[in-house]
Design a protein with these regions (language model features):
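Alpha-helix-loop-beta-strand connector modules within alpha/beta enzyme cores
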Residues: 42-62, 111, 122
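N-terminal beta1-alpha1-beta2 module of alpha/beta enzyme domains
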Residues: 1-54, 131, 149-152
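Internal, glycine-rich beta/alpha segment that forms the wall or movable "lid"
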Residues: 2-6, 73-173, 181-202
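A cross-family glycoside hydrolase active-site/sugar-binding cleft signature
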Residues: 35, 61-63, 92-94, 155-157, ...
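Receiver (REC) domain switch/active-site residues of two-component response regulators
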Residues: 30, 172-175
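Acidic-and-aromatic substrate-binding clefts and catalytic sites of carbohydrate-active enzymes
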Residues: 35-43, 67-72, 180-186, 210
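The substrate-binding groove and active-site-proximal loops of carbohydrate-active enzymes
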Residues: 7, 61-68
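Residue-level signal for the nucleotide or nucleotide-sugar donor/cofactor binding architecture
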Residues: 12, 68-69, 107-110
Length: 210
């Protein structure tokens, strides 16, 4: 009932989570985040594939934790779920540690930048020839692609310098928590400048609990 207060009746389960998404779909919400986390319980990708067969209008913002899946396989999963949804899938990139492991933030965000490049290349239907720090891959795009024929918008959040740089280099929508107007203006100005240094532009959004 209250954010941050555990309630056994509101645990991560198919019944509870599917009810939330179906209610949001019925009430006319445009997009809903499907969070990812080992401690949450149900797997986000499996849940997204299942709920995609039931919703009618809403878009799904599926969170993916970089490192959990081999990027080409993740690209196939994203494209498959997008097909089930009729082209309404968006993706939230998560860059935190794997369960039971720790990695310094700098290499974690470098890995995330590589993964975003791989995903975008394959989901744009382009052949991949990638010689990176974390993956060395040379392969054609998967036979199944996005409904639009293009990679979905990649959402990303994080305020550390490494997180901001990773977002500027690879994401499409930078997510923020609601904050004071002057703080939000400062973040937008900083991220706009960072993205411009890579010849890119960003969109911005809020993440909020309803």
């Amino acid at each position: 009932e209250f954010l941050g207060v555990p309630d056994p009746l509101l645990k991560s389960s198919w019944e509870h989570c599917s009810d939330i998404v179906m209610q949001a779909d019925t009430l006319g919400f445009d997009n809903i985040l499907l969070p990812s986390g080992y401690a949450l319980g149900i797997d986000t990708t499996a849940f997204a594939a299942a709920i995609a067969t039931l919703v009618k209008r809403i878009r799904l913002l599926m969170a993916v934790r970089i490192g959990e899946s081999w990027p080409p396989q993740l690209a196939r999963q994203i494209a498959t779920i997008d097909r089930i949804l009729g082209g309404r899938l968006t993706v939230n990139i998560i860059s935190s540690d794997m369960p039971g492991e720790t990695m310094d933030s700098e290499p974690r965000y470098r890995r995330t930048v590589e993964a975003m490049h791989i995903l975008k290349t394959l989901l744009n239907g382009e052949p991949l020839d990638h010689d990176g720090e974390f993956w060395k891959l040379k392969l054609d795009p998967p036979p199944i692609g996005m409904v639009s024929g293009k990679a979905p918008p990649l959402y990303f959040g994080g305020l550390s310098p490494a997180a901001r740089d990773a977002a500027a280099r690879g994401c499409d929508v930078f997510l923020m928590w609601p904050d004071r107007e002057e703080m939000v203006k400062g973040i937008i100005a900083d991220m706009t400048a960072r993205a411009a240094r890579y010849g890119r532009t960003l969109r911005f959004g809020y993440r909020a609990h309803v």
